[in-house]
Amino acid sequence: MASSSDRTAAAYPLLLLLLLSSSPLPCSASAADSGRLFPAGVQYEYESTTTVLAGGSSDNRDPAIGHRVVGRLLVANIWPATDTAGDKLLMLHFKSPKLQTWSKKSKNDVNRQFIDRKSRIDRFSDQPFFAHWRNGHIENLYVSSTNSLTEENFKKGIAGLFQFQLSNQHAVEYSTLGECNVTYSKINQNIVSKLVDGCVLPTTLPPEIKHPDKIWQGTLRSKREGLVKYNHESLVDVSLDEYHEFSTSFMNEVGASVSSKQHIELKETKPNDDVIKANTFKEAIHQLEKQLKLKLEKQNLSLKHEVKNCKHYNSCNKLDEVVYNYHDSLLDSELGKSKSAYGAIKVVDAIVNSDTKTIKKVLTDEKNEDIIVQLYDLLGAALNENSHKASMETLDFTNAKSVEKIERYLWSASINFNPKIEIIKSLLAITDENLASKKIADTLFNTVTAMASRLARYNHTDTNILLSGELVVKTLEKLEKCKLDDDECILTYIRALSNLKHPLSIEVLLSFAQHGNRKTSAYAMKTIKMFGPGLWDSRVLKYCNRIFFQLVKEQDSSTRTIALAILLESNPDYDLLKHVVEWLAAPGEEYEIKQYALELLKEMANQNETSARLLRTVLVRERLNHYGSMAQRGLSSCFSRKFINYNNITGLVKNSQQIYSGVTKRGSVDIVLEHDSVKYDLCSFGMFTTGLGYFTSLYDDSGKKDTSDEANLPATAGLELIVFGVHIRPFIMFSSQGQLMGHVWAGTGSDKTPIIQGISQMIEHLEYVPLSNGITAELNVKGMLSLDISGQIEMSLWNKNAQSVIEKNGGVSIQGSLKLDTDLVTDEVDFSLITEGLLHMHSDAEFATKIVLCMRIVFVDTNVTTIVSKSEKVHGLPHKSHTTTTRTHPVSGRTFALNQMVNEFCNTIHSR
């Protein structure tokens, strides 16, 4: 909620416009007023102060750092135009410049004093510069050669203060800020306010990098306003204030801010005899060059930007040294922790600034053998020309021993939101080669499709869209060539279609969903659900209706429940809800699918109030609100629980467990963020099993014999993972009864065993904020996720019980900086967020006489640590000021309730 001061500031220009709208001055009057200012033959001396302060976000109360430049500004109109008073040639001369910073003796903001510092500002040329001023606009500057871009941009900032209008009006102005909309409001006879917004950045700035998903961009709030005071012939006082604040979407206090204040105040007026007599402006400039014996360069007010990264200063950290310093952070034991995510950012930065030879040297160094797969993670995160070339020259796609390194590189690359098209094409070429294993072929093709889809979404050019479309066609062709009984081949390309998310694939997926076998139909239906409501047209909903109610043929229960989930998330009508509830009350269906369908109805009602009201109406009108329909007896569950609700972000844990024979047939735990009514899928961890029919007689006491295909399927269990919308190939734990019993007798899973590990980049943000004073603020943010999903299971055939735990551990580090880098001084604010998300799923089962199954989902206690560091370096001086503030915010854990039957089972087991 905005503060009262924020609301007052926002309403102030509007209030002025309302008060003054009764007597507006026409534009011609404004031109006449401004035309009488700065008559020829008079010199005006101003006291000039330009202040720049940088600090943390507004929620961070620590003192800011900053500097200011003070001096005297001489202004004179040296050309009395004969044709119109609207044209002037202003001479601007900045004299006696001084750089000032805060005194170290000052301990707080109230009493802080600026003091003079020795600096390179003494090297500024003592030459005037000239502005072509026309009716309140600076058309061009005429400047002699300067010693630095800092000086040149500073002069443009000074000249920008002389852009003004003296009546109520809207104008478009070009300045150091770019092309901006400016609103002028007359406060009284001699004061005009100025409000600047809607700026389009100058084309002279480098390209920016912004994630297509708003939640990963963060928020930049800007405000620019000024005052112009004048008398009958000159400006008396001009000020222009601006404030910019960036914060991450996750925590307002993690970010940085910069403020700038330009101020000139008239101190003295004296005669000026240096007047040029010329008939035209061009002739006046020519005479001026002769008189000063200088060559004047014509410029506009756009900033000239110089990239001042570590390469500019020849100070880049050497990759081998950075890897050595953060070696222990990248060990397997640190995965899933914030320590590895923090170190990963440092290593990725070093990789980006390294050549191919240097990267290969680090990869082949024996000292890095224990972190080699993590290094390939980071090469995939960096994903530039050099890192990709080094990876391709050190990875052997024909060697089965390289599978882990290859997959880790490809998984990390597939999540990168801004891949290069050249890299995608190079990987695409490898897909047609003879590869070492089906795992590599699966991962490689899915990586290419995921990267192409992300590129087309991020950079919506014809070339990128064409590549994505070509891959859709290629994937469909490969899918068509798969044998009907080759599920592995079919599923590989269905996963590729899920990564591409293209409407062209809908028809094929619907066909597999309705006519495929139990495995392919469920995957096809799940892929359609992943596409989201944007692609669920009437045709999709029609197929879902047929599949759920089995109007064409008998369908797999997983396929049916996914189809029902799509229907219920598509604003269902009265008739659909009526038919679903009637189906719940009808006999003949296996009760676990009914339990799951009931859970879906409850979840729909929790998430959508309109659908909830409609469901209540159906239950009352159709007299269906009774035990037979609304009180099923199964263990299946489907629910979502909030684990965070902060800063307009809602974090949800979504759990889905479809039970068959007392065992999870298909389940998933999803982590979802909601921001500004948009959902972002962070991670989905799924599990599937078949053929564990041994438990049926213990679980189902109804006496009915299972006649479905489920009972005759081989014993299988596997895991599947979706990270940031990218489908990773599944991991098969066992695929036969023999393998299962081998694990049981050997106790394979009794120790904690990694399922999937890796480090990937989730945030990359580069933004430039030009200031009115001529300085450009550079905002750079990176975020890494270190993931470790591990499992452990213990089973006793003697005691007939089992315990298992699956841990999803994610370490997150977000590091950013706001830098104001000039030849005089560098001000920098570094901010970071460090945290860990630990989500554990516990299961306890007893199956001596009857199955008792207790499942718990636990969000473990954790901390969120924020760090803000501020530093200032005056170039040419040895000292550098530096302050750091660290805060830790505890986050309480919680255990999420499932359904009533599971709770009763938990009470039974834990009471013994």
Regions found by a protein language model. Give the residues of each.
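Long internal repeat-built scaffold domains in very large eukaryotic proteins
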Residues: 324-325, 329-359, 369, 385, ...
